[in-house]
Every structure is written in structure tokens, then in C-alpha cells.
């Protein structure tokens, strides 16, 4: 079963053997089976984000579903959100990628927007994060929900309070990125 991309601002790409990339939206928007979702814990249906989760990436890779990456000016694949917590600016992206894979009219109002208010510098005063001010301001997720509702694309919207990981040093919500990492066991000295 296939479906239409809900916010078609960027087309998925896949890397090629020669180190390049190609547009791959024809493979992307499909319902696929998985053995880690049950009806005992919910509907039995889950959205996956292959760009941001190891389990999701493995399931998508096995089904041939490409990730939703941006291609920067260096030719590197990057998630839509940069390491500072905001959507990439169009002028930071590869021109050929933008021409072939980005709906500039739809994406331009989101470029440079912070995905979580906690990462917007206006909510950090003298090195201290002002959580109350950040929560009081309109967040991008609320903005996107309202855009979907106005476009008639939202079936139902309601707020759910749930646990979300926060950094123990900054109290800011954790943003996940597909990064190569290495660790040093400092307790083994």
C-alpha cells in the first residue's frame, strides 16, 4: 500500500555506488510490515523515521525505503535538521539537490526554523535556559499542526503528555542525529 507524502517539501534520496545521490520518492511512501509493533500496545501501526533511529533504519533498509536526507554544498548527506537544532537554510544545500528534490515554495518558510524552542537562542539568557518562556511561545510542531489543519490534512489533533529524554546538563530536549560515534570507558582506569 502506498500513500502521499504529507508535507512534500523535500523528496527522499538514496546514495549511489559512485558516491552520488538520486531522487527516490517512488520507493519511499509505502506501508511495510514489521515484527516489533503489536496491537497490545496501541493500534499496531507506527510511523518510522529511518534517518533518526537505528531500528527504523534497519526496517526501512530491509524494505528498500530511502531516508529523507538533505545534500549540503559539500555533497554530504545530512538530516533536515542541522546540529544546532534548526532546518537547513536553502543556501547551505547543494544547488542540484535543491533543483531536483526541494519544493522551494513549501520549504522556504521552514528554513532556519528551530525544531524545538529550547534550541532557539532567544530562550537562553546568560547561559540559562528559560523553559517557561520556551513553552509559552508557539513551537514548530504546533505551527505544523495548524498548517495541516488549515490545509484539511489533519484527521485529529490532540495534545498528549509523555516522557521525552532531556539532557542532564542543559535540561533541553534531546535531538537524535545519525552520527558515527566512539566512546571512551573512563571507569576502566
Q: What is each stretch, according to the model?
A:
Residues 1-189:
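Non-cofactor substrate-recognition interfaces
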